[in-house]
């Protein structure tokens, strides 16, 4: 195992190079300095080498021991402050990848460019893209702690994982053999004052329904778009009843097939990530000649249905169509099968938790649907706090796929995180929160997936709590981070470290 420790330097280049054109003056200054620097480089899931190297450079220039894994995970060790050498180590953890979402008119290449941050002093957001506060604000807070020699703290093991957003690949790959801490503070939660102590397990299901694109000459082509949906995180927002572009497009096509026999599917593209509720879907169909006007009228009528049904959850939903070239399309017979399968597939909340009122127990998100030369690809994110329910939902997907002549590949199966009734670590954190704010912290479980479950499997006896500053509408272009909440959260983390000595 390769470790590196380089000569210390009082001001790391990562910190010196920060321009701070946007976030300068926001407190805590060092946290937002690191956050702005991290946001200046691309770091979408699967594209984490640059941001991983930034973390390595930081450790090198502070003279801290570190390890960088082939997958780009980074572990950094900081010795205890004077007088705390005998205290148990604490693991501080966050992930360095983000969900890259952008508006339809955004020209930014998020695989090559950083984000354009904006702030009004109370909130931070990114212009026309997601912010990636989930979870770079955690990384920024941890880097600030590692760089601050005035803090009182036990030995710190900082763990930065990759590709959490696409199946927790970094947590799966993480080598924990040299981690000594038995207390984990995960900073990947999004409600201040809420302390997560349990989470759902999950898995991904990738479905392929084979289909061939053949000549569609002599037919009328139309493009169809469902847009204006709010989208959101499939763990945090699935219970809100927001429309899924993929699901709604399936309903549009199913209804159209009843009115326009012979309709053929020519294109389908909805969603980018299986764990994000699809906010826009584009499709194209080939119709028998002479059907155009009737089809346009049908689309206008169906838009009214959607606007009525989703007036509260998605008030800006639109359904439009326009003439389009459709040189090739799936056969009419196979189109029927594909659309039937699409509408039969489960989506949304399946069951609510009986122990935590208001918490989703089991759900499935039809996150991505694409038609290509191989057929119709459907990617699902399945979540449940009960392992058997998770597997039963996966069985339903396999059953529908099999009836349509398709196949399913399953991946990214991760365990849930079971609630610990007694936890001194949790009690210390809650006491610190009460002393700092005068409020009682809220202890809850989440339907979202967290890396804590995987790390607890890898490190026997590990105790964990997840918390974080106020983040709204993560994974979407409306994502925003509260500045005052970040300051309070950082103060709480520092106080927890002090009390852990």
Residue ranges, per PLM feature:
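Zn-dependent metallopeptidase/amidohydrolase metal-coordination segment
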Residues: 28-31, 354, 361-374, 439-495
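Acidic-enriched catalytic cores of C-N bond-cleaving enzymes acting on peptides and small amides
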Residues: 214-219, 238-269, 288-363
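Fold-level recognition of mixed alpha/beta catalytic cores in primary-metabolism enzymes, strongest
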Residues: 153-245, 253, 257-258
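A short beta-alpha structural unit
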Residues: 36-40, 284, 318-329, 367-369, ...
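Active-site metal-coordination/substrate-binding segment of hydrolases
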Residues: 84-182, 208, 332-336, 346-347, ...
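His/Asp/Glu-rich mid-to-C-terminal helical/loop segments that flank catalytic regions of hydrolases
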Residues: 177, 242-259, 287-292, 336-343, ...
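Acidic/His- and Gly-rich active-site-bordering loop/insert found
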Residues: 17-123
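Active-site-adjacent substrate-binding region
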Residues: 244, 251-267, 419-462
């Amino acid at each position: 195992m390769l470790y590196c420790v380089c000569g210390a330097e009082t001001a790391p280049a990562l910190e010196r190079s920060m321009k701070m054109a946007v976030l300068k003056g926001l407190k805590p200054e060092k946290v937002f300095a690191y956050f702005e620097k991290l946001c200046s480089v691309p770091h979408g899931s699967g594209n984490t080498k640059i941001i991983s190297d930034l973390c390595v450079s930081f450790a090198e220039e502070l003279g801290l021991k570190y390890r960088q894994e082939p997958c780009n995970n980074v572990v950094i060790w900081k010795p205890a402050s004077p007088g705390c050498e005998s205290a148990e180590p604490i693991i501080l953890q966050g992930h360095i990848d983000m969900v890259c979402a952008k508006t339809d008119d955004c020209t930014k290449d998020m695989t090559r460019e950083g984000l354009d941050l904006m702030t009004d002093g109370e909130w931070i957001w990114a212009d026309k893209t997601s912010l990636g506060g989930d979870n770079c604000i955690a990384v920024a807070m941890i880097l600030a702690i590692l760089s601050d020699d005035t803090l009182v703290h036990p030995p710190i093991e900082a763990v930065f994982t990759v590709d959490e957003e696409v199946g927790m690949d970094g947590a799966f790959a993480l080598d924990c053999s040299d981690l000594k801490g038995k207390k984990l503070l995960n900073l990947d939660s999004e409600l201040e004052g809420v302390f997560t102590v349990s989470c759902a397990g999950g898995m991904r299901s990738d479905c392929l329904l084979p289909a061939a694109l053949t000549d569609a000459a002599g037919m009328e082509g139309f493009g169809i778009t469902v847009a204006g949906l709010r989208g959101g995180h499939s763990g945090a927002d699935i219970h809100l009843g927001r429309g899924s572009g993929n699901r709604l497009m399936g309903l549009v096509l199913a209804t159209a097939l009843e009115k326009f026999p012979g309709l053929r599917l020519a294109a389908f593209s909805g969603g980018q990530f299986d764990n994000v509720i699809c906010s826009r879907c584009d499709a194209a169909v080939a119709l028998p000649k002479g059907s155009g006007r009737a089809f346009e009228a049908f689309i206008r009528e169906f838009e009214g249905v959607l606007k009525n049904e989703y007036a509260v959850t998605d008030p800006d939903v639109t359904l439009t169509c326009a003439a389009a070239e459709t040189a090739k399309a799936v056969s009419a017979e196979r189109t029927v099968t594909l659309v039937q399968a699409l509408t039969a597939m489960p989506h949304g909340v399946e069951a609510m938790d009986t122990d935590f009122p208001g918490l989703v127990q089991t759900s499935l998100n039809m996150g991505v649907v694409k038609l290509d030369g191989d057929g119709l690809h459907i990617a699902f994110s399945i979540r449940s706090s009960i392992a058997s329910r998770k597997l039963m939902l996966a069985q339903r997907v396999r059953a529908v796929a099999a009836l349509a002549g398709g196949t399913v590949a399953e991946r990214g199966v991760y365990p849930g995180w079971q609630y610990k009734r007694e936890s001194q670590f949790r009690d210390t954190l809650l006491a610190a929160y009460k002393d700092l704010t005068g409020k009682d912290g809220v202890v809850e479980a989440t339907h979202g997936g967290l890396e804590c479950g995987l790390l607890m499997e890898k490190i026997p006896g590990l105790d964990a709590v997840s918390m974080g500053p106020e983040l709204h509408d993560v994974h979407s272009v409306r994502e925003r981070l509260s500045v005052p909440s970040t300051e309070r959260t950082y103060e709480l983390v520092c106080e927890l470290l002090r009390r852990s000595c």
